[in-house]
Amino acid sequence: MQRSPLEKASVVSKLFFSWTRPILKKGYRQRLELSDIYQIPSANSADNLSEKLEREWDRELASKKNPKLINALRRCFFWRFMFYGILLYLGEVTKAVQPLLLGRIIASYDPDNKTERSIAIYLGIGLCLLFIVRTLLLHPAIFGLHHIGMQMRIAMFSLIYKKTLKLSSRVLDKISIGQLVSLLSNNLNKFDEGLALAHFVWIAPLQVALLMGLIWELLQASAFCGLGFLIVLALFQAGLGRMMMKYRDQRAGKINERLVITSEMIENIQSVKAYCWEEAMEKMIENLRQTELKLTRKAAYVRYFNSSAFFFSGFFVVFLSVLPYALIKGIVLRKIFTTISFCIVLRMAVTRQFPWAVQTWYDSLGAINKIQDFLQKQEYKTLEYNLTTTEVVMENVTAFWEEGFGELFEKAKQNSNNRKTSNGDDNLFFSNFSLLGTPVLKDINFKIERGQLLAVAGSTGAGKTSLLMMIMGELEPSEGKIKHSGRISFCSQFSWIMPGTIKENIIFGVSYDEYRYRSVIKACQLEEDISKFAAKDNIVLGEGGITLSGGQRARISLARAVYKDADLYLLDSPFGYLDVLTEKEIFESCVCKLMANKTRILVTSKMEHLKKADKILILHEGSSYFYGTFSELQNLRPDFSSKLMGYDSFDQFSSERRNSILTETLRRFSLEGDAPVSWTETKKQSFKQTGELGDKRKNSILNSINSIRKFSIVQKTPLQMNGIEENSDEPLERRLSLVPDSEQGEAILPRISVINTGPALQLRRRQSVLNMMTHSVNQGQSVHRKTTASTRKVSLAPQANLTELDIYSRRLSQETGLEISEEINEEDLKECFFDNMESIPAVTTWNTYLRYITLHKSLIFVLIWCLVIFLAEVAASLVVLWFLGNTPFQDKGNSTYSRNNSYAVIITNTSSYYVFYIYVGVADTLLALGFFRGLPLVHTLITVSKILHHKMLHSVLQAPMSTLNTLKAGGILNRFSKDIAILDDLLPLTIFDFIQLLLIVIGAIAVVSVLQPYILLATVPVIAAFILLRAYFLQTSQQLKQLESAGRSPIFTHLVTSLKGLWTIRAFGRQPYFETLFHKALNLHTANWFLYLATLRWFQMRIEIIFVIFFIAVTFISILTTGEGEGTVGIILTLAMNIMSTLQWAVNSSIDVDSLMRSVSRVFKFIDMPTEGKPTKSTKAYKNGQLSKVMIIENSHVKKNDIWPSGGQMTIKDLTAKYIEGGNAILENISFSISPGQRVGLLGRTGSGKSTLLSAFLRLLNTEGEIQIDGVSWDSITLQQWRKAFGVIPQKVFIFTGTFRKNLDPYEQWSDQEIWKVADEVGLRSVIEQFPGKLDFVLVDGGCVLSHGHKQLMCLARSVLSKAKILLLDEPSAHLDPVTYQIIRRALKQAFADCTVILCEHRIEAMLECQQFLVIEENKVRQYDSIQKLLNEKSLFQQAISHSDRVKLFPHRNSSKYKSPPQIASLKEETEEEVQETRL
């Protein structure tokens, strides 16, 4: 980054913001890059601001029993805040003084006061000086207040992040990722957007008092009539605001439902395409959209009338103020025009500034209180360690994940009695609520010496991970003692990859040791994988390492744990995603050799690992089932296999530990922090028996967005959720918002705070941060470039010259240094965080406007209608102005008039009434015309938004995966959330406001020019200067906003990344390291945001200067031109002042319209995505008069009306697959054939392309070559017809928000009897019957109440219902408990006995059921043969299969020399199969 010119700028340059000129010039001439942005001043550094606020907050905590965050903020920022408030007040005072000078100028034209004509020019100079002074005071004050708001936000951002790293796991279990992102985005945005308005809470009352005093001097008691009307108007607007918020609360639930379904669709778009559910998902979302739009229109109409009431209230304010006075004392033009000017200022203070200020304080104080509560939550407590200790000891340890759960679960069980079924059976759903009321670990004892290996085993839910968490201090023991040195390293069960290079992920901020690093890489079998990357270990990994396979991610996580020099290594099932050969090699070379002198605790279920362990601890239902050596285990616990592998009969499981639908998910439910409802009520709300979604998912919009576990901000989770990446082009007051909330757009009073506890926000079901940390993370999709880098160290001291890539490319070393990737440039940051679809022009093109306008044929006619009404309004206004300008009004009782005045007429009571009747009639006409002018416009624009959403949804569903793979899920979701919200809420009313303000300014200029033609000499240059200056500014400002939005992405991405890996971060003690990274992300965003604020103020100040010059010209032309009467001069100067008061609003609206139209540009980008083929509906076959619901195609290779496929024969010829067009081939020249009904197993290392081959079969990739099914080539039929030939069980199971019935049959083709029949076949019936409502029970959060195995059964049922003849299975047994796995095995044998099955699996017993095996190595087919031939040849399969498996396969080949190992008498045959399990 460049050094900021602000550091050397003079006072004048700072006052006029001239120091921003270089960046404006560069942005106008060329495209701005991150390197062009100026460095932030040290006063804006996140390090300095956070340290300052943290010091005051600690002081507050130490000195008071009831600490207040606002006190800490006051000590940090109060005096600067008040200084700028005084400047703002002085600027506002000039607005009250201006009408006084206007009245004196008009009075100087009174025929009876010719002596005062000579002072008019001096009064004009004074009036112009007031405008100049106001300009010089107002803009520095507003900029200073925005600056303070920004600093407050940065300081609290940092404070919240630091607190997040300290929170206890119990607190994290009650906080969702959406809450944290909301805390950082929606709540803290109030300081950026509202601090400039906060001072009006005291400025507005003073302004009103001053104005009322001045109006009293003119009109006496009549002044309060106008004030009363304004107060009534404000109350009316408040009522409209409450009505609008009622509609928005109702709509929030509907928006949330749509976004939940949309986010699930985006996250699982590959599954949607594989199942051919595009039409079903589109119909489902469009139905929700229709309901949402009904409420959107109602809210928009209310907002429209609210805004219109303000615009057209001016007539009545003046009328009600002047009428009583005129009826009593007659009319004086000076008083009319002065009153009009006063009323303009008074109206703004009463109906806008003061209510906005009150709402700002209400929202800000609410946000501060919410942040304050968060900062006082329980922190993570480190255990007391003894660094000299060499052993690990646990004595009589008992622990709960949550204390005090017993009473809650008892209440839940009592309430469940009301949910018993009609036959009297207990509702099994509530039978397991007591689980968390029991200890997760109970009376655990063990001791291991230095250098020993402890293997921890047990069935699912036995407490293995909880044991590791307790050793790390994440889970506090309620009883007992834990003893170890405290120097811990940890490898999580689910791989956690942070954005950065492979090298940075392994080193993880620790000082670099070349020898140790290379040894770890070799031991973890990463050498071959790294060698395939052009940048080697310096390749930049994005969201969760999406470019890597699951096995590669697992090995990187293990390497990170091993690289750290620790006394105790905790390894939580690190081999889950590895093939058998890689697993064996890593276990031997890494765990047994490289770490031989280290103390290790390994969670495993492998018999080979238990045999080599020094000690074994088997957990069962949280208790220690066995502790000792392997030989002792065989002698003392011959039934250990059932406890180890979980082969107890399902019916024999205890009620607390039964493998039901809740056992592994209970901790996912928790209360919203401030929601005043009970846990039980929350559960009841979540599981109502109704088909409607609205009562199931009343989450906030933010939580729905962040229900995606991919964050491209982040997310961008991202809630921001993405969590979180966007080029936000909203108006200033919403620019930092991650996602649209129920309050986006212009404030309607009284606005309800984001932190409200209304019904739409009170009851929530969400996944806590703890659950996110303990479950596999769904990865985003992005493309990352490969880069090279050399490294050097720099000190940790704050540096102003850190580049934007420092966010993730520079890493702290153990000696408080940073690892810097020097050769990584800005492009790498874009690849980690930016979407490829974001390359839109800096300024909205005219083509976008034209395309938007012509999208709906009625919109053009509506715009013409608005223009006609405007011309009518101008004509009506001229009628009033003619009466005011050509009729001399005088006080009643004063009948003196000049005979020389050609217009001299004494106004009697009768004629006064006559004039005011005309005025009232014209005012009523204008009000009616104004209301009817904008209403069709708002209605039509919402219809256009509906069309855009439909087109974009259809385009995304029909887009090829090669295009979608280049986008981030958060980026796609933000199109449907943020951009659609802008199109629904902000854009229609902003366009209306802009048109209204533009017409006011144009109309005023036109009238002034008509009354005094010489003013045209000043009008033309001013208009030209405005247009040129606006174009010059927008070219740079929009680029700065893009960069600011891009800079916001790493902030939320880093937050979400930190939360996902919090246990790892704390185990490694890298909290300071991640705090520094977070501060760098904040500094990057601050640099862009601060520069945007400065350039925006530069533009607005110069626009105001231009119009001040225009006002000066108008003033002196009207004063110096002879022959003008007081009416004409009053009209000209009053309208000129009205232009000045409306100008800034109009300018801001013009900028906002251009910014919001960028959302339209982004939507058009998605609409214009290519399609992957024409979607066609399958032909329905009828047999015996009944709909068979089986696909029939018309093809030259198939006889007419033959059902296809009939056998499932596949022929693959020269198949080549690529993820993106023009990319490297993932599979090359694959050729083989599969006979009908045959089972084929896919073999290969992790990352060899097995899953890619299955995707290629479904044509989800860019493919070349040919595949035929039963003689039909994939080129001869449509894409949907081809995919319907397959049944799919993917690795990542897709369960969308909806009923069981909808999830199994989204097209509603099958009857309940048929669905229940299939549920029986696959073993799903008992699961569904546990829920209230059965098939009508609504699943939410990706089916979080279902275990992974139950979700696999859902996929199996879908495939059975689809009547598919070819079944593709991609590691269906991953993370399954043995009971569910056996159910799936049996279901596969029964339901797909005559189908072709292609299986990618790691369990040997499943693969042994295949007749043919396809071995893939180096992107090609190495072997394809039967199991007999593969066993006789040297192959991957021969190395993987054990001797015992060969004996079971070919018992007649058993050699007499071979002696089987001693058998444990009580082991069941099925259990022995599992004991000998290995992975491929």
From Swiss-Prot:
This is Cystic fibrosis transmembrane conductance regulator. Residues 81-365, 859-1155 form the ABC transmembrane type-1 domain. It comes from Ateles geoffroyi. It catalyses: ATP + H2O + closed Cl(-) channel = ADP + phosphate + open Cl(-) channel; chloride(in) = chloride(out); hydrogencarbonate(in) = hydrogencarbonate(out); ATP + H2O = ADP + phosphate + H(+). Gene3D superfamilies: ABC transporter type 1, transmembrane domain, P-loop containing nucleotide triphosphate hydrolases. Epithelial ion channel that plays an important role in the regulation of epithelial ion and water transport and fluid homeostasis. Mediates the transport of chloride ions across the cell membrane. Possesses an intrinsic ATPase activity and utilizes ATP to gate its channel; the passive flow of anions through the channel is gated by cycles of ATP binding and hydrolysis by the ATP-binding domains. The ion channel is also permeable to HCO(3)(-); selectivity depends on the extracellular chloride concentration. Residues 1470-1480 have a biased composition (Acidic residues). ATP 2 binds at Y1219, G1244, R1245, T1246, G1247, S1248, G1249, K1250, S1251. Residues 1452-1480 are annotated as: Disordered. The modification Phosphoserine is found at S549, S660, S670, S686, S700, S712, S737, S753, S768, S790, S795, S813, S1444, S1456. It is a multi-pass membrane protein. Residues 1386-1480 are annotated as: Interaction with GORASP2. GO terms for molecular function: ABC-type transporter activity; ATP binding; ATP hydrolysis activity; bicarbonate transmembrane transporter activity; chloride channel activity; chloride channel inhibitor activity; chloride transmembrane transporter activity; intracellularly ATP-gated chloride channel activity. Keywords: ATP-binding, Cell membrane, Chloride, Chloride channel, Endoplasmic reticulum, Endosome, Glycoprotein, Ion channel, Ion transport, Isomerase, Isopeptide bond, Lipoprotein, Membrane, Nucleotide-binding, Nucleus, Palmitate, Phosphoprotein, Repeat, Transmembrane, Transmembrane helix, Transport, Ubl conjugation. It comes from the Eukaryota. ATP 1 binds at W401, S434, G458, S459, T460, G461, A462, G463, K464, T465, Q493. Residues 654-831 are annotated as: Disordered R region. It is found in: Apical cell membrane; Early endosome membrane; Cell membrane; Recycling endosome membrane. Its EC number is 5.6.1.6. Glycans are attached at N894, N900, N909. A motif (PDZ-binding) lies at residues 1478-1480. Binds and hydrolyzes ATP via the two cytoplasmic ABC transporter nucleotide-binding domains. The two ATP-binding domains interact with each other, forming a head-to-tail dimer. Normal ATPase activity requires interaction between the two domains. The first ABC transporter nucleotide-binding domain has no ATPase activity by itself. The PDZ-binding motif mediates interactions with GOPC and with the SLC4A7, NHERF1/EBP50 complex. Residues 99-122, 217-222, 320-339, 880-918, 1012-1013, 1117-1130 are extracellular.
